[in-house]
Amino acid sequence: MGSSTETLALIDEAVQRPRQRTGIPEDLPTPVDEVELDRWCAAYLASDATASQRTPPSVRIPNGPSADVAASWGGQSLVDSALIQIPVLIVRGEWDHVTTDEDARRLFNALRGASDKRDVKISGGNHWLHLQPRRVALWAEVRSFLGER
């Protein structure tokens, strides 16, 4: 499922489940076990009170962020990052297929006005790093960055 209206897309469990493996080398095990993924999928569907009214149950998500990502991948800058003057932490997993090294480098270099900027790539994770065993490293990086403020 992945049908959309002008402003919303409907995303079901069958679409979400395979995403947690995207970018992870084939010879490595899936870092999110089935029990954890089942729990996450249930919480994901519960996040939309209308999910159970559709078959299959699905979550309404705004299309805006997807359009913004597509525009960015197409070379269109959506903001003038040089105007950002606050501390910025860019953090991603080593196998993140959404935020690539090139994307992070481009943003890091564009943040010319940031009072502090840091680019961190965490080993052993992809774009779903927040659900994976290496999420502890993600939390540590965020805590460290925020603790310095």
Ranges and model annotations:
Residues 2, 98, 129:
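A short, conserved beta-strand element in the Rossmann-like catalytic core
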Residues 97-103:
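Conserved alpha/beta-hydrolase "acid-adjacent" motif
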Residues 141-149:
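C-terminal alpha-helix
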Residues 2-89:
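Alpha/beta-hydrolase
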Residues 6, 104-107, 134-136:
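Short, glycine/charged-enriched secondary-structure capping and boundary segments
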Residues 85-92, 96, 107, 117-120:
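Catalytic His-Asp charge-relay segment
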Residues 125-139:
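Catalytic histidine-centered segment of alpha/beta-hydrolase-like enzymes
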Residues 112-128:
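Catalytic histidine neighborhood in serine/cysteine hydrolases
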